[in-house]
Regions:
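A SIS-like phosphosugar-recognition module
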Residues: 1-101
Length: 101
């Protein structure tokens, strides 16, 4: 199984028309013991399952939501990479994918 108590699952869940379906998926993850990191503008009490960490973002217009949700996701990626010892300023294989004219 891919999900167990050692696997954090980052969930981006704006409080919109798809929120209930996202909550259903989160409950499946929680039932399998996964650690849920919730990034949402909704109250974590609305989820109905245990959340390891809740990163709260402000409620904004749906057109601005991608910008608001991008910041915590970038910070999660940055801090995960530095924790793992990855040089975030010199990523591996970058020269192979970037061509200079």
């Amino acid at each position: 199984a891919l999900i167990d108590e050692n696997v954090p699952v980052v969930v981006v869940a704006p409080d919109d028309e798809l929120f209930e379906k996202t909550v259903s998926n989160m409950q499946e993850v929680a039932a399998r013991g996964g650690q849920i990191v919730l990034v949402s503008d909704a109250n974590s009490d609305k989820v109905g399952c245990r959340v390891a960490t809740h990163l709260s973002v402000p409620s904004v217009h749906p057109f601005a939501a991608p910008l608001v949700y991008a910041l915590p996701m970038q910070l999660i990626a940055y801090h995960t990479a530095t924790f793992m010892g990855t040089d975030v300023d010199q990523p591996r294989n970058l020269a192979k994918s970037v061509t200079v004219e």
